[in-house]
A protein has these predicted regions:
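Membrane-lumen/periplasm interface segments of specific transmembrane helices
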Residues: 82-190, 204, 208
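Transmembrane-helix motifs of polytopic, lipid-linked glycan transferases
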Residues: 1-14, 186-193
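Transmembrane alpha-helix segments characteristic
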Residues: 196-218, 228, 251-253
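Hydrophobic/aromatic-rich transmembrane helices and adjacent perimembrane loops
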Residues: 223-241
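Signature aromatic-anchored transmembrane alpha helix within multi-pass, membrane-resident enzymes
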Residues: 118-122, 244-272
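Short acidic/glycine- and proline-prone juxtamembrane loop motifs at membrane-interface regions
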Residues: 38-44, 225
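Specific aromatic-rich, kink-prone transmembrane helix
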Residues: 6-9, 26-29, 44-63, 82, ...
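Transmembrane-helix signature of polytopic, membrane-embedded enzymes
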Residues: 7-29, 200-202, 206
């Protein structure tokens, strides 16, 4: 419930009441919506991330730090928030340079708050590998633990950023899989470049694009992918999903119809 409220407030802050209502409905009734009712970390993570994004949009930078730190120790992926802060800093700085009142448009207190908050969130996002190394005495402890989840899908692999999706695709589908990944990535670029998506604002766009980049860089796509896509829910405010009432209703019906299938596949037959 908290994630839905904050998502509504976030989309309302960058869009309209129509977009906010429908984006929240699509999020709640998505195929993976049932995960919000079970004891998974997603519910807490989404509350923290949506709260941090809302604080970013409202320029309450110091509030982002505690939310980001707690989120970092809830689930991986908070580095996307740090990158979004960096993009926000650059955009505000560039805007201030074009103004004759730069000190008023972008005061130093805001610059300091953004930099400090970004560094704190980034440090928290990188903390688990350091903790794992300190506890086990092995510098590769965290990475080996993560790679152990890959064995059942692609066997033993060496990690290199931006390769997991291609490894998974080539293992199961060969060259066709590589082409499929390229098509998916091209589709993502097309979606983010649409005017209706960019209308959600730099902050939402920066975070969701950064989070998508994080998934492509380090995550092996398997049945957990739908669950890990939940933090990108602010994009549901795009015209692609809620541009018209008919379009929004269609997506809502699709989500509701797919929920039973997702529950069977990801809960009874597998794990989300």
């Amino acid at each position: 419930a908290g994630a839905c409220v904050l998502l509504y407030r976030l989309v309302l802050a960058v869009g309209s009441a129509h977009r906010a209502r429908w984006a929240t409905a699509l999020f709640a009734f998505a195929p993976t919506g049932f995960l919000l009712q079970v004891a998974y970390a997603e519910s807490l993570l989404l509350v923290l991330l949506f709260g941090a994004l809302l604080a970013l949009v409202r320029r309450r930078y110091w509030l982002i730090a505690p939310l980001g730190v707690v989120a970092a120790f809830t689930k991986p992926g908070v580095l996307a928030l740090a990158l979004a802060l960096a993009v926000h800093l650059v955009v505000r700085w560039a805007g201030a340079r074009r103004s004759v009142r730069a000190a008023e448009v972008f005061p130093w207190r805001d610059r300091i708050a953004i930099v400090v908050t970004g560094l704190v969130v980034a440090a928290a996002g990188l903390a688990w590998p350091v903790i794992a190394t300190a506890v086990t005495g092995r510098p590769d402890a965290y990475l080996d633990t993560e790679l152990s989840w890959w064995v059942g899908f692609v066997g033993r692999q060496h990690f290199a950023p931006l390769t997991p999706w291609f490894i998974m695709a080539s293992t199961w589908l060969g060259p066709l899989g590589i082409g499929l990944v390229v098509v998916v990535l091209a589709g993502a670029v097309w979606f983010f470049s649409r005017r209706s998506t960019r209308a959600l604002g730099t902050d939402v766009l920066a975070f969701t694009a950064s989070y998508g980049l994080y998934l492509v860089a380090v995550f092996l796509p398997q049945q957990s992918l739908p669950r890990l896509l939940l933090p990108m829910a602010p994009l549901l405010g795009s015209d692609v999903f809620v541009g018209t009432r008919r379009r929004a209703v269609t997506w809502l019906v699709v989500g509701v119809c797919l929920q039973p299938i997702a529950i069977v596949l990801l809960w009874f037959l597998g794990y989300p």
